[in-house]
Amino acid sequence: MTLKVSDIGEKELVKYIIANSKKITPDDTAVTPFLDLNLISTCDMLIQSRHFPKNMSYFDMGFKAVTVNVSDLAAMGAEPLGFLLSIAIPKDLEVDSFKQIIDGVFKACDYYSIPLIG
């Protein structure tokens, strides 16, 4: 039997993210001192059936989720200071698929040299 995310629950999923990130804290918020600079935030919600080709891997979906937000910041001439992840997943998603998404997020954060901060 394949383990589903509904089998382990949200707390275990969050534990996986925290345990595998170099910069994340268990807080729900991140505070970045910015002095006289402007802090620009962005958040794009991507929907599997709308924003991803049917044959795109879960890893690539995670990578794209970071990339589209970095692109929005670049369009404004801003440098990303960190990435806040917001994800909605079906309760019957396989845990391995969830981990592939998150691994794609981690890889993109490494690629763009930005920490996953929450």
Question: Where are the regions a protein language model picked out?
Answer:
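A glycine-rich phosphate/pyrophosphate-binding beta-strand-loop-alpha-helix module
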Residues: 70-118
